[in-house]
Design a protein with these regions (language model features):
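N-terminal capping segments
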Residues: 1-70
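...with weaker cross-activation on analogous glycine-rich loops/strands in unrelated enzymes
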Residues: 2-3, 70-122
Length: 122
């Protein structure tokens, strides 16, 4: 299948309702083992589960990886996978692919008063 934005968006929409877990138990179920300890199937996939940080970056990376395969996802994400949103943003800037006008399927970043701190898909 082609590298269309619809593919990654469809995968992300399929994950709506997924709630983070209190431990590594039942990671593939959307609403079992609910807790605020940052355990998710997305973090497990990348081997960085339970970080005391948001998991939005791992989620977007996972969606791209599922949609396009590991190596193609890395290329589309401008370098590599990261659990830290400022690092992911730097990948785009380094490759001169940063834009303030997102298109459908783009990884988008949100900034608080200090730094980029969250992200998602357009």
């Amino acid at each position: 299948m082609a590298k269309t934005p619809e593919k990654v968006i469809k995968i992300a929409i399929g994950e709506v309702g997924y709630i983070e877990k209190k431990s590594n138990k039942d990671l593939n179920y959307k609403k079992k083992n609910v807790g605020a300890n940052n355990y998710t199937k997305y973090g497990e996939y990348f081997g960085i589960n339970g970080l005391q940080a948001y998991w939005c970056d791992m989620f977007v990376d996972w969606c791209f990886m599922k949609a396009y395969g590991r190596e193609n996802a890395k290329k589309l994400l401008c370098g590599d996978f990261s659990a830290y949103t400022p690092t992911s943003a730097k990948y785009y800037k380094k490759k001169s692919r940063w834009s303030n006008i997102p298109k459908k399927g783009d990884q988008i970043f949100f900034k608080n008063e200090k730094r980029i701190n969250n992200q998602g898909l357009q």
